[in-house]
Amino acid sequence: MAAWAAVLFAFSACQDVVEVEDLKAKDDIPSNGAPEITKIVLANDKEFEIDGADFEDMVRVEGKNLGNVVSVKFNDVEVDPKEIYARYDMLLAPVPRQLPGEVTDMLYITTKNGSVSKPFTVSIPELKIDGLQNEFTNPGDTTVISGDNFDLYGITVEQADVRIGNAICTVIDATRTDITLQIPANAQPNTDLTIQGGEMAEPVAIPYMNPGFQIFDFNDWPGSGGFTHSSQFPDHTTNFLCDGTEGEGYPEPLNEGMKYLRFHSNVGAWGWMVLWAGYIQVPAEVTADPASYNLCFEVCTNASYPLGSTTRICWGDYMWMPGASGIPVNTYGGWRTMRIGLDEVSENKIIPDGCSPAPDNTAWKIVFTPTDAMTFDLSMCNFRFSKKIG
């Protein structure tokens, strides 16, 4: 009964719909012979036979003599016996969330009366590393690396080896999707940060304070051929350019001595507030292989003015909608790195197909155009083209 309770809990936890009462009500025929498999389905979709599943899927095996189970394995990973329910003609077992030591693409069932196996492929999720939450975190400060499946690959507090060059980062906390770490005091800018987990053959490198290909020179802002609409906002700094010394409400720069743009004002529904328009020069490396690059920049939002579902900002002809998922972007007064693939499409791409490389010019703009009237208090800086991770 304990095993059945565990399975029933697993079903309710993942919202699988199984006719458990019907199964329990059936007379259980004694399993006296070697086990046989006639069909494998997902527990919540008995109609369609499957030959593979994902981690944590609940699998239903149909056949004969499946009672008196001793073990169930996917590849060489054994299912916790407490999570198995077995009877003469049916067996339920979840695919464990664990990397196999050896991939055999087989399901193995052993009972007191014999064993049976059947080809069955378990999809193994890849390690996903999005990068540092703030690629320009100052030495000594803490930040987060986001991604997925860190636990599977041994990126834990105990096992993770994270360093910038030879400087070791202190891992403070680790979950399936995030690592919290402290940047070492002796970390050097423009040095790769490497991550090595206990289940990884090779480390993964991500950029730390890598300037990439800078799009703007804030020491020559708005630049030759560029213009802003700052004249419409007399209370703003000249051309929206700041260095953090302006007073209350102005965040500290991303790094010492850096400048940034701050826009704090209202824009009407479907308005067209041009923060900057002009020409940029796109490096030949980027125009030759745009799919390998991101547009990266750092943002800082006032906690009272997150970027919600109505936010739209044009980068060139690309329409950035950071809150479209329903989760607002709010950095609560800190700086955070944003990344948008140059091959992504939202109305258009960030740089046009067939874009000519520098020294040719490419028309570009930054425009605030929300779908509903909203107040912005957004600071931005460090616009660059950066190579994608991996």
State each model region's role:
Residues 15-67, 113-158, 189, 199-224:
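Beta-strand/beta-sandwich contexts
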Residues 101-113, 189-199, 364-368:
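Short, aromatic- and glycine-rich surface loops/edge beta-strands on solvent-exposed regions
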Residues 218, 280-307, 340, 383:
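Extra-cytoplasmic beta-strand recognition segments
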Residues 243-274:
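Short carbohydrate-recognition loop motifs
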Residues 297, 339-384:
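Extracellular beta-strand ligand-recognition surfaces/modules
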Residues 304-317:
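Beta-strand acidic-aromatic groove motif in beta-rich domains, primarily in extracellular
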